[in-house]
A protein has these predicted regions:
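Loop-helix junctions at membrane interfaces
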Residues: 2-202
Length: 202
């Protein structure tokens, strides 16, 4: 009797195993691995961009200006690059972390709070879905980001100084920042497009 029961269970288990679609299971495992791999690559790329943004803002053509920790730089170009190469939420994180770290490392920690708010806003105008970095939308996005960033920092400066006149004067002097960042973004973007960077990192 027990032998018959065991044989019955054995036949049932074998039938269940045969009925399972192993191909579907393997495809699901592959899909999950792809998702994990994509997420891992995206997180690593985000951290890398945060480091690049921090370095370029803090040390590459970094020009101190004024006596309250202000400075001009062209590191925003790499925020724009992050915005066209990474999904928007990740680009925003890279922009906030990298830029705020640059403020802290260069003795401008008083600007870090404003930076954490302003820099992520700049990435919202770009698209990372196009096969090319330089396209009509991203060119206009770089222009808008430069203008908006300048205005927002002027407002932040006015609040910090208690004088919008002083903030406006420093903003006019610092117009090299959005202009320089725009030019560098276009130059690097065109070079990357020629090398088909976006297709290679997908």
């Amino acid at each position: 009797m027990w032998i018959n029961v065991i044989n019955l269970h054995k036949c049932t288990i074998i039938k269940l195993i045969k009925d399972i679609s192993w191909r579907d299971i393997m495809e699901n495992i592959k899909d999950q691995n792809k998702n994990v791999s994509y997420k891992t690559r995206t997180l690593v790329s985000t951290a890398l961009f945060a480091g690049i943004i921090c370095t370029t803002i803090a040390y590459f053509l970094h020009v101190p200006m004024g006596g309250s920790g202000e400075y001009v730089h062209v590191g925003d170009a790499f925020i724009y690059l992050a915005a066209v190469l990474l999904p928007t939420p990740y680009a925003a994180c890279a922009a906030a972390i990298g830029s705020a770290m640059a403020d802290i490392l260069t003795g401008s920690a008083n600007w870090a709070f404003a930076t954490i708010i302003i820099k992520p806003i700049l990435v919202l105008f770009f698209t990372s879905k196009s096969k090319n970095i330089i396209n009509v939308r991203n060119v206009f996005a770089a222009i808008i980001a430069g203008i908006l960033g300048t205005i927002l920092y002027m407002i932040a400066g006015g609040i910090m100084y208690g004088s919008f006149k002083s903030a406006f004067i420093l903003t006019v002097v610092g117009l090299i920042q959005p202009v320089g960042s725009f030019i560098i973004f276009i130059v690097i973007g065109l070079a990357f497009d020629k090398l088909k960077i976006k297709q290679k990192i997908k």
